[in-house]
Amino acid sequence: MDDAVGERLERLNSMLKRRGIILPAFEIHGGAAGLYDFGPLGGRLRNRVQQVWLDHWLSQGDITELSCPTITPYSVLEASGHVGEFSDFMTTCDACEEGFRADTLLEEYHSNPDSLSKEELAQELAKYSPPCPNCKESEWGDVSAQNLMFNTRIGSGKSGRDGFIRPETAQGMFTNFQSLYRHFRQRLPFGAVQVGKGYRNEISPRQGMIRLREFNMAELEYFIDPEVEIKHDFSPWKGKEIRLVPDNSEEVMMSIPAALESGIIRHATVAWYMARTADLLENLGIDLERLRFRQHEGTEMAHYASDCWDAEVHASYGWVECVGIAHRGCYDLSAHEQ
């Protein structure tokens, strides 16, 4: 990021604070990285965005809303794979002993450092020796995985259980599948949405509101029968080209129906939700010239996904992920059933 962009962001952050939109949390006690308050205007703006999101998806007709606890038993997130897999690779500066995400240190040297393995990250750090964001030295320790969930204890004494503060809202929707199935009279497809808080113990929160330790999430889970074809109506998007970045390929401008027909997008329901997401973002004021859908490389795919596309918006920090659309297959339901 050049100096001019940095100065503009400083002025923006100052304005957001001055006008009561975004405020550093617990500032009179020194604050805490990755925690922010929504002020009087910020809270109203957030609520309006959330309501637009809810109205957009609930209007589809086969989607309902849930609200699940943020405190989650250990067994739930063990079954989902989060206990073993929900982690980022970190390294520590030998000079100042601050920890950082290894991939973020390499963003200026590699086109997609999030796709690198632990060994590859270590090799790239040794090759480029990026400066420490804190002290500017270039002495890095070993790369290791750190789980991102906040631990807690549910209850006290002998009857207490280990648990976590949820890292995503999705698991409550999966564990309620049978109730949802009955609600929809035992007919697929159907979906559920949930708006609420998510919590991740980020290694190095940065970029203002982009990477936080407590944040607002809005998730939709849509359940289909893989043996029954759904006839999605793509006619509204046939002439509407959008920027796509397929796995290991060059960026292309193509309509979502054309990308589905050509096999770039592998599943019709994934394509449907990409198109509907583009409509939502445009309705919220995002310039489609600044929007792209990027497919995850195999090495960066979440443990539960067989395919994933991120909706990214080009901003002062570069391309910023704002929506993830993943084909989770039967992973979650099978995991909880076992």
Feature-to-residue mapping (PLM):
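TRNA-recognition modules of translation machinery and tRNA-sensing kinases, especially anticodon-binding
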Residues: 2-338
